[in-house]
Amino acid sequence: LQLVFDNSLIGVAIDRFGKEIPVLKESETQFRTFVEISVSKQFYGWLAGIGKGVSIVEPKEEQEKYRKYLENIWKL
């Protein structure tokens, strides 16, 4: 899974995924990382808690699943 985070969330990413995650500069304000995880509703909830500070970049299928998850919450 490829994720892009705001730079201010580096500690959050390390707390969640560990110190060994790759951290690549995406822009002046963001970094990209690659993680191997089992995606679940709990993971989506964690992402939603961070808000706009993180986004799923790849795979596109997972990005779409997360978007649908958020839409379903919005409909509640």
Predicted regions and their residues:
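Polybasic (Lys/Arg-rich)
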Residues: 1-76
